[in-house]
Regions:
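Short connector loops/turns at beta-strand edges and beta->alpha or beta->beta junctions
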Residues: 1, 55-59, 254-258
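Short beta-strand element of Class I
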Residues: 3-6, 118
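Structural beta-sheet core signal
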Residues: 7, 52, 93-95
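Conserved N-terminal Rossmann-fold NAD(P) cofactor-binding segment
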Residues: 8-48, 283-287
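Rossmann-like NAD(P)-binding element
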Residues: 31-91
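Rossmann-like NAD(P)(H) cofactor-binding subdomain of soluble oxidoreductases
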Residues: 65-131
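C-terminal substrate-binding/catalytic lobe of Rossmann-fold NAD(P)-dependent dehydrogenases
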Residues: 110-117, 126-289
Length: 289
């Protein structure tokens, strides 16, 4: 996707290891050979896209709540944004670090970074997990499922079930159309989506493949100017009448970053879940302001 990749890490030895490991894959790639090297924050001045993965992550056996990372990673994010904004305010920043929505909000608001250029991976991977799980239940390809996980990348995320469909077949017709023995258990499925990433951490120590491809999906949409609609974390500016937080909404992603956000019509259950999510994230932000 990119012809030049610069790795920045306070541990230069580790950065060099990442560069060496990644550079060996270029022999297999049927694309332009990328120049992969170790760099510094000064390299940000020429960057089109900056991907932030810095800070500690959830560890096996510890809390399953990403908010335990809050205090440490807020400081890490502030340090990184101070460095980045010294050299650029025009690069698209993709935040991968947790707690996702809090860090995305702080990075945009405290540094007055252009809203459309600061994107969190948010519920993009949660949505992929949901589509895969629902597709398996119905016996179809996950790419035929249209459905979004919205809100927080965490415990208050929710699914607007009224907007879920498979090739136009509405969710309430799934049992009949796909020959299911019983209706889809919405609460159970959403719970499985929420905990699956944490389950992977317990099993292998970390998550990697899913989030890596999620980042690639965003980078690809930007580099190819796709105007793809994907769920991503963005600071709200009046969507659903809300502001003062970042959370995931369907976003149109292009070379300009977030071209626009879309608002899925919500039923009463969706509106209730949106309010719960908003109030939770707002309380967390106020606790660190």
């Amino acid at each position: 996707l990119a012809d030049e990749i610069v790795v920045i890490n306070r541990n230069e030895k580790k950065a060099l290891g990442v560069v060496l490991d990644a550079s060996h894959t270029t022999a297999f790639a049927y694309s332009a050979n990328a120049n992969i090297r170790v760099g510094t924050y000064e390299d940000c001045k020429d960057a089109q896209i900056i991907i932030n993965t810095a800070g500690p992550s959830i560890q096996p056996g510890n809390s399953r709540d990403r908010m335990v990372l809050l205090q440490t990673n807020v400081q890490v994010m502030k340090e990184i944004m101070t460095q980045i904004t010294t050299y650029t305010r025009s690069a698209i920043i993709i935040n991968v670090s947790n707690p996702m929505d809090i860090l995305t909000y702080i990075a945009q608001k405290e540094f007055n970074y252009p809203r459309n250029l600061l994107i969190g991976t948010g519920t993009l991977l949660d949505t992929a997990r949901f589509n895969k799980m629902l597709a398996d239940l119905c016996g179809v390809d996950a790419k035929n499922v249209t459905g979004f996980v919205l809100g927080e990348h965490g415990g208050t995320s929710f699914i607007p079930w009224n907007a879920v469909n498979i090739v136009g077949i509405p969710f309430h017709d799934f049992q009949k159309q796909f020959g299911l023995k019983e209706p889809v258990d919405c609460e159970k499925l959403l719970h499985e989506v929420k905990v699956s990433g944490l389950d992977i951490v317990e099993l292998k120590g970390y998550t990697s493949s899913g989030i890596a491809l999620s980042v690639c999906r965003l980078v690809g949409a930007i580099m190819r100017n796709e105007r793809a609609v994907v769920p991503a974390s963005v600071v709200l500016e009046g969507e659903y009448g809300l502001e003062g937080i970042a959370m995931s909404l369907p976003c149109v992603i292009s070379r300009n970053g977030v071209e626009r956000t879309l608002q899925i019509p919500l039923d009463k259950e969706g509106e209730k879940n949106l309010k719960i999510c908003y109030e939770y994230l707002r309380n967390v932000i106020e606790s660190i302001s």
